[in-house]
Amino acid sequence: MLLLKKLSEAAGVSGCENEVRNILKEELKEYADFKTDALGNLLFEKKNKGKKPRIMLAAHMDEVGLMITSILKNGFLKFESVGGIDDRILVSKTVTIGPNKIKGVIGAKPIHRQDPKERENALKIKNLYIDIGAKDQEDAEKKVKIGDYACFDTEFEIFGENIVKGKALDDRIGCFVVAEILKRNYEVEICGAFTVQEEIGLRGSGVAAYQLKPDVAIVVEGTFASDVPGTKEEEYNTVLGMGPAVTTMDRSFIANKGMRDRVFEVAKKNNIPCQPRRTNLGGTDGGRIQSIGEGIPTIVISVPTRYIHSPVSVADINDINNTILLINSLILDYQERGV
């Protein structure tokens, strides 16, 4: 899990994925040839060129976060969200800002000073600020610039029984899975991309797929798990500990039926736990990849993850390992039977 720890703790808000990209290039330099395209996608080709079919693997490097929009006279920072973040979870959270990783705390008007009406309503992002301990605007401007990114400051840890917690598991968990697959050898062509700007509109994946021109694509995600108090069992999207989740449909994507059926067949044949992703909420790079060129048969396989798009997410190590096993088995099935 050392690589996943590095990936989780790296700063990589949409549009600023450099740190994540560098970690992956260093980790995988022995296994693949890399190219960074104009948008920032990290494209790869396995060093041992195989036969058809040409299989694309994709996982996005970016995470939701914040961007500094103004520096006030008293040294506090105003900000906007980058990607989908619930304003209600921001107060009192610690962040790191910009290339120098300046520490900050997200603050709000003290509850003791809030009137009854203010206390009844959830705080909006426009009412929040970041405190970096600056004396005034001049002091703050020495440390931070408008346009700097801020990401949550969260330590990756293993806790409980085979459970991990950390920030940005959507989708550093997918990057980790793809990295582990890249370390294996296959007789088919393996290409793919660690993509950028997924959280703000699936921007990188289409550019990547256009360049790679695969026969089929496998997108690896960290999807939300709703197996928590307050949600009825029949409304669970995915459940921790029940294996990778296979998407039928989300707001951007409808799975290739043949690929979806094949994934479940491969899982059953190899005794790998696997679950359907039950709701059609959210969107993934799969929606963009499948519509490139003449169309690319695509499947999205995800690791169930609680509390995504927040300062800390939770996932099951067994689900991560079973996702690696499932994708490995699926590639071997393509190697044996073709498309």
Regions found by a protein language model. Give the residues of each.
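N-terminal hydrophobic/helix-forming segments and targeting peptides
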Residues: 1-339
